[in-house]
Amino acid sequence: MEPKGTFEGKKILAVDDERDVLEVIAEQLEGAHLITASEFESARQVIESEPLDLVILDIMGVKGFDLLDLARARQLPAVMLTAHSVTARSFQRAIDKKAVSFLPKEELSRLDELILEIFQELSKGRTHWTKLAQRLGPTFKRLWGETWEQIKFPQDPNISW
């Protein structure tokens, strides 16, 4: 599958305190109207004022979970993206706070595929958690061992605002 160019008309905010990560996101999401922010305050302003199709939030460095709360208040679907917080605790917190997905930065080279998959699920009114578990479950199980089996996925995959 070659997903590039399938993001036409999508307005996406990407928030990360690492410029090189934002550059990779821009390359991966070619065709989208991409807005980037590298710190909390500018991201907050965009979330509170722009109509967005998706928000991609780093967890560390930019207060990603606080930004997730703001995005959810505006009924904006948000994906948590992280390198340093690839923990079962952060994963569960993302589910509990109603993010639509959680992506390790080690998957950045496949970000376009993953975001396309997320948009497909969103178009059906669903989160990406089930697809994510199918796609990256073995990776998370390798990282977290038995803890992976204890993750509490949403009972209803439909988006609830």
What are these regions (language model features)?
Residues R19-T36:
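Two-component/phosphorelay signaling modules centered on CheY-like receiver
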Residues V24-L29, V46, L70, R93:
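Alpha-helical interaction/dimerization surfaces of two-component signaling modules
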Residues D66, S85-E117:
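Alpha4 helix (beta4-alpha4-beta5 surface) of REC/receiver domains from two-component response regulators
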Residues R19, T36-L54, V62:
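Acidic, metal-coordinating helix/loop segments flanking the phosphotransfer/catalytic sites
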Residues I56, M60, L68-A71, Q75-R89:
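A short, hydrophobic beta-strand element within the central beta-sheet of small alpha/beta folds
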Residues R110, L114, Q120-W161:
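CheY-like receiver
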Residues G9:
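Phosphate-coordination loops involved in phosphoryl transfer and adenosine-cofactor binding
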Residues A14-E18:
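Acidic di-acidic motifs
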